[in-house]
């Protein structure tokens, strides 16, 4: 090797790095086509968002119109059915301070109250036209003394005894059966 070529390489070594192509690595497209592509993508995204918002608004408007029309034609019984249809298939469990737990089963229209000591469980049928408030339930259940049936007398029959198997409480639903499964039931 010639000494002159070594010195030339040392003074200016070859550059093996890739040539800069800009931010986006599309080698076959010129810059003006890249910009046009970006603008088209942004416009399409904006159109999709606007169309989605319009369709969602149209759906909400249609549901509202159907509900108003059904309520005006059907009067109170439709309003009652609509109010209960929102709650159908749901249960709600509420603590009443430190004194007990209330479970409302809106599908079976049952209300269960278990006092804090857990000696018994009160069951009450809920009227479909008037769902009581939590304050009214607390007053009603706390007005009844939370005594076990042995102290109140065994006049309640088999419904006052503790449930011996899970099949006996199947008609109550899962939430109420779990709450009242191990204690005697008292129907109000």
Swiss-Prot record:
Biological process, per Gene Ontology: respiratory gaseous exchange by respiratory system
Localisation per UniProt entry: Secreted, Extracellular space, Surface film
Annotated keywords: Disulfide bond, Gaseous exchange, Lipoprotein, Palmitate, Secreted, Surface film
A Pfam match: BRICHOS
Domain BRICHOS: 94-188
Disulfide cysteine pairs (residue numbers): 121-180
Annotated propeptide span(s): 1-23, 59-188
Gene Ontology CC annotations of this record: alveolar lamellar body; extracellular space
Ranges for region Disordered: 144-164
InterPro entries assigned: BRICHOS_dom (IPR007084), SP-C (IPR001729), SP-C_palmitoylation_site (IPR018051), Surfactant_protein_propep (IPR015091)
Entry keyword Cell cycle: no
Lipidation (S-palmitoyl cysteine): 28-29
Additional detail: Pulmonary surfactant consists of 90% lipid and 10% protein. There are 4 surfactant-associated proteins: 2 collagenous, carbohydrate-binding glycoproteins (SP-A and SP-D) and 2 small hydrophobic proteins (SP-B and SP-C).
Reported function: Pulmonary surfactant associated proteins promote alveolar stability by lowering the surface tension at the air-liquid interface in the peripheral air spaces.
The name this protein goes by in its record: Surfactant protein C
Lineage: Eukaryota, Metazoa, Chordata, Craniata, Vertebrata
């Amino acid at each position: 090797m010639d000494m002159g070529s070594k010195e030339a390489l040392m003074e200016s070594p070859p550059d093996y790095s890739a040539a800069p192509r800009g931010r986006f690595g599309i080698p076959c497209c010129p810059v003006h086509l890249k910009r046009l592509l970006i603008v088209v993508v942004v416009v399409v995204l904006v159109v999709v968002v606007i169309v989605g918002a319009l369709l969602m608004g149209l759906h909400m408007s249609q549901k509202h119109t159907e509900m108003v029309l059904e309520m005006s034609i059907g009067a109170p019984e439709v309003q009652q059915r609509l109010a209960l249809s929102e709650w159908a298939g749901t249960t709600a469990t509420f603590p009443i301070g430190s004194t007990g737990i209330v479970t409302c089963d809106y599908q079976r229209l049952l209300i269960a109250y278990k006092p804090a000591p857990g000696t018994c469980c009160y069951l009450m049928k809920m009227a479909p036209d008037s769902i009581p408030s939590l304050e009214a339930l607390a007053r009603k259940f706390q007005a009844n003394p939370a005594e076990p049936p042995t102290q109140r007398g065994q006049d309640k029959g088999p419904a006052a005894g503790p449930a011996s198997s899970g099949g006996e409480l199947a008609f109550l639903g899962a939430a109420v059966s779990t709450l009242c499964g191990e204690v005697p039931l008292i129907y109000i």
